[in-house]
C-alpha cells in the first residue's frame, strides 16, 4: 500500500510516517513546503517532495506517478490567533491547499482521506469535553477554513464516494515539534 502524508516534516506527519515505516511494509510519500517543519524530521525511507499544496498540477503529477492509496492530510498553517490578520494566507494554505488534495483524491480514486482538522471548529461556545454532536461555530478564519474543509469532505463523499476520516486534535506536543513559532505549538513553548 502507498500512503501520502502531507506536512511530513512537521510533528504529526513525521511521527506518523515513522510509525508506518517501522510497523508496516507500506510505502510513504511525503509532501512539505518546509514552512513549519524541518527536513531533519523526515524519516529515512520517505519519498519526499518539497512543494506548495496550492499547486494543483504538481499534486496531480505526484498522484499520477505514485498512485497513493491513502492520504493523510496534516499540512496546515496552524496560527489560529494570527489568522484574523493573515486571512488570505490562512485561506490559501488551509482551505485551497486542502481542496486541491481532495480534488486529486477524487480524480485518482483514493481509498481514504484522513484530515487533521481542529477543535477550533467549535469556537468558544462550549466548555470541554467536546463531542462530535456539538454544532460547529468557528470564530476565526483558521476555524472557518478547517470547518469548510470538513464540509467539502462530506460533499465529496456524497457526490463522489470519497471515504474520509476527520480528527480534531488540539494543543498536542511531542518530538519533532517546531517550538520557535510564537503563534503555534503553545504547549511546546510553555
Model regions and ranges:
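N-terminal Rossmann-like NAD(P)+-binding domain of SDR-like oxidoreductases, especially those catalyzing
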Residues: 1-172
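A general alpha-helical scaffold signature found inside nucleotide-binding enzyme cores
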Residues: 93-96, 185, 189
Amino acid at each position: 500500500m502507498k500512503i501520502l502524508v502531507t506536512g511530513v516534516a512537521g510533528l504529526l506527519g513525521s511521527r506518523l510516517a515513522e510509525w508506518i515505516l517501522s510497523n508496516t511494509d507500506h510505502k510513504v510519500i511525503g509532501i512539505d513546503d518546509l514552512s513549519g517543519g524541518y527536513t531533519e524530521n523526515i524519516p529515512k525511507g520517505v519519498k519526499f517532495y518539497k512543494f506548495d499544496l496550492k499547486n494543483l498540477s504538481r499534486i496531480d503529477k505526484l498522484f499520477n506517478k505514485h498512485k497513493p492509496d491513502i492520504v493523510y492530510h496534516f499540512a496546515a498553517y496552524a496560527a489560529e490567533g494570527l489568522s484574523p490578520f493573515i486571512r488570505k494566507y490562512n485561506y490559501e494554505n488551509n482551505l485551497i491547499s486542502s481542496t486541491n488534495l481532495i480534488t486529486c483524491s477524487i480524480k485518482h480514486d483514493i481509498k481514504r482521506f484522513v484530515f487533521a482538522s481542529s477543535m477550533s471548529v467549535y469556537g468558544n461556545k462550549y466548555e470541554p469535553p467536546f463531542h462530535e454532536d456539538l454544532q460547529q461555530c468557528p470564530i476565526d478564519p483558521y476555524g472557518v477554513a478547517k470547518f469548510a474543509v470538513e464540509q467539502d469532505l462530506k460533499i465529496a463523499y456524497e457526490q463522489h464516494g470519497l471515504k474520509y476520516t476527520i480528527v480534531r486534535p488540539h494543543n498536542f506536543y511531542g518530538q519533532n515539534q517546531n517550538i520557535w513559532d510564537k503563534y503555534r505549538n503553545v504547549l511546546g513553548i510553555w
